[in-house]
């Protein structure tokens, strides 16, 4: 289970919405992450890592 989280976090750093999508699908978390990534790459990364680790 820890290796899956590690892969999701790595994907979240490279392309934030992908990591969140793998865990939550098209839920609200994905759309928030996508919006933050479009508005600024760094906020998208921070949010994605926070959502995946929390």
From Swiss-Prot:
Chain ranges passing through the membrane: 2-22, 34-54
GO-annotated cellular components: membrane
Keywords assigned by UniProt, alphabetized: Membrane, Stress response, Transmembrane, Transmembrane helix
Recorded superkingdom: Eukaryota
A Pfam family hit: Pmp3
Keyword Transmembrane helix in annotation: yes
Main localisation: membrane
InterPro entries the UniProt entry points to: PMP3
Compartment(s) where it occurs, according to its Swiss-Prot or TrEMBL record: Membrane
Membrane topology: Multi-pass membrane protein
PROSITE patterns the record matches: UPF0057
Residues spanning the signal sequence: none
Induction: By cold shock and salt stress.
Similarity annotation: Belongs to the UPF0057 (PMP3) family.
UniProt-recorded name of the protein: Low temperature-induced protein lt101.2
Biological source species: Hordeum vulgare
């Amino acid at each position: 289970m820890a290796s899956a989280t590690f892969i999701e976090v790595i994907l979240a750093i490279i392309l934030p919405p992908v990591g969140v999508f793998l865990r939550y699908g098209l839920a609200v978390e994905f759309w928030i992450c996508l919006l933050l990534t479009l508005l600024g790459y760094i906020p998208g990364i921070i949010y994605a890592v926070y959502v995946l680790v929390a």
